[in-house]
């Protein structure tokens, strides 16, 4: 089951709560409220999305967590983003069908000037059993409090959580830009995107192994950007993947 995580320290979560007033309280666990978003449980806590570390609570409610959050960037522009969290060298469990379905829905419903992007794996929390997907609105206070923009996010969630998810090839990406350059393959239904290891990570085989084993669906394809993953690490990564009969796509 899905579980939505809303953080009172986050302006997008607060706008979400304003837009969806009918979220009946189910129970209180300490300072954390468990409410209902449609037919799905929603956790409301006082901190920031990246501070939430109650995986035990998530697992008691569902296996697939969706964190509602603001997005920030150095050169702000209106944007919807989706990504799996992870503060390397560890990461959360990625849910490629869910993350990619939400990404497609956001892109489908986004109105100018909003764009959409699939981001590389970054920032906490790190989960071990429950999957974690961040869904974000950016990139300034104006967008975080834009009820129409956050309404698109709500619409995308309601649409995705109420249907079967895609069945494209689960794909991991190694050495990509922070804003993934292979997102079009997800939009057209060819792949379901999982962990994206950014080029600034200085990827090692251990990074790849950690990410590879933390997906809800088996990784079938890995895109490796050659110029951003230097040997001997690149050769080790390719060997590891091919030994597991994973399709390796070398780019760049």
UniProtKB/Swiss-Prot annotation:
Keywords: Hydrolase, Metal-binding, Zinc
Enzyme Commission numbers on file: 3.1.1.96
Reactions catalysed: a D-aminoacyl-tRNA + H2O = a tRNA + a D-alpha-amino acid + H(+); glycyl-tRNA(Ala) + H2O = tRNA(Ala) + glycine + H(+)
UniProt-listed Gene3D superfamilies: AF0625-like (3.40.630.50)
Superkingdom field: Archaea
GO BP term, pick one: D-amino acid catabolic process
GO molecular function annotation: D-aminoacyl-tRNA deacylase activity; zinc ion binding
InterPro entries to which the protein is assigned, alphabetical: Deacylase_DtdA_archaea (IPR018033), DtdA (IPR007508)
Enzyme's top EC category: hydrolase
Cofactor: Zn(2+)
Bound cofactor: record note: Binds 2 Zn(2+) ions per subunit.
Subunit organization: Monomer.
Role description: D-aminoacyl-tRNA deacylase with broad substrate specificity. By recycling D-aminoacyl-tRNA to D-amino acids and free tRNA molecules, this enzyme counteracts the toxicity associated with the formation of D-aminoacyl-tRNA entities in vivo.
Protein name from the UniProt record: D-aminoacyl-tRNA deacylase
């Amino acid at each position: 089951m899905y579980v939505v995580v809303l953080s009172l320290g986050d302006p997008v979560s607060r706008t979400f709560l304003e837009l969806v007033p009918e979220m009946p309280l189910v129970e209180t666990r300490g300072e954390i409220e468990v409410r209902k978003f449609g037919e799905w449980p929603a956790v409301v806590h006082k901190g920031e999305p990246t501070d939430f570390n109650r995986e035990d609570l998530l697992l008691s409610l569902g296996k697939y967590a969706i964190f509602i959050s603001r997005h920030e960037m150095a050169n702000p522009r209106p944007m919807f983003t989706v990504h799996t969290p992870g503060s390397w060298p560890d990461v959360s469990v990625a849910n490629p069908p869910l993350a990619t379905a939400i990404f497609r829905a956001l892109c489908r419903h986004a109105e100018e000037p909003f764009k959409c992007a699939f981001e590389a794996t970054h920032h906490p929390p790190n989960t071990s059993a429950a999957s974690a997907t961040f869904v974000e609105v950016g990139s300034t206070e104006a967008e975080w409090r834009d009820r129409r923009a956050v309404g698109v996010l709500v619409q995308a969630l309601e649409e995705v959580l109420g249907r079967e998810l895609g069945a494209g090839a689960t794909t991991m990406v190694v050495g990509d830009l922070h804003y993934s350059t292979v997102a079009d393959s997800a939009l057209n239904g060819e792949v379901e995107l999982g962990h994206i290891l950014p080029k600034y990570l200085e990827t090692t085989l251990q990074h790849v192994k950690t990410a590879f084993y933390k997906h809800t669906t088996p990784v079938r394809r890995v895109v490796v950007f050659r110029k951003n993953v230097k040997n001997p690490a690149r050769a080790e990564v390719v060997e590891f993947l091919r030994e597991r009969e994973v399709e390796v796509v070398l780019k760049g």
